[in-house]
Amino acid sequence: MLTNTQVSHFMTTELVTVHPDDTMDKVRDLFEANDFHHLPVVRDEILVGVVSTRELLKLTRNIGTKYDKKIDDDYLSSILVGEVMNKELITIGPGENIYKAIEKFNQGYFHSLPVVYEGKLVGLITSTDLIRFMYNELKGERFLF
């Protein structure tokens, strides 16, 4: 039953993270190598921000209309994650229920919700995770990662 389902049952726990002092070329490389669009930014296990493909696209659009990988590499390697990450975070706890997660997604225009316990990042939920979970629940199946 959805009312009893906690966030911990469908959050992703194997996370790739970056540090605020990492450069945006590392972020670009991680996005290119993986099938995700959000990266939690962590300092000493504490979530300090999130960087997404949206921030990366804003930066690369500033370069110009003609793509030049060398210019792109030089430019992105000069920008720190901490300079462009989203610091205004909406988070959720692993013990919260699915309705709280839906409510938080409904609050704003974002597609990932960091799961934080005692100040530390323990998981991540994306809007895709939530839709997939609800679809499987409605089909009568349990969604497990």
Where are the model-predicted features located?
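Tandem CBS (Bateman) regulatory domains
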Residues: 1-14, 52-90, 97, 102-106, ...
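Short N-terminal signal/transit or membrane-insertion segments
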Residues: 12-20, 47
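The conserved cystathionine-beta-synthase
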Residues: 18-35, 42, 83-85, 91-109, ...
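A glycine-centered beta-loop-beta connector
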Residues: 31, 39-55, 105, 113-128
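Short, charge-rich amphipathic segments
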Residues: 32-40, 59-60, 66
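Short, surface-exposed, polar/charged, turn-prone segments marking secondary-structure boundaries
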Residues: 38, 45-46, 67-70, 77-79, ...
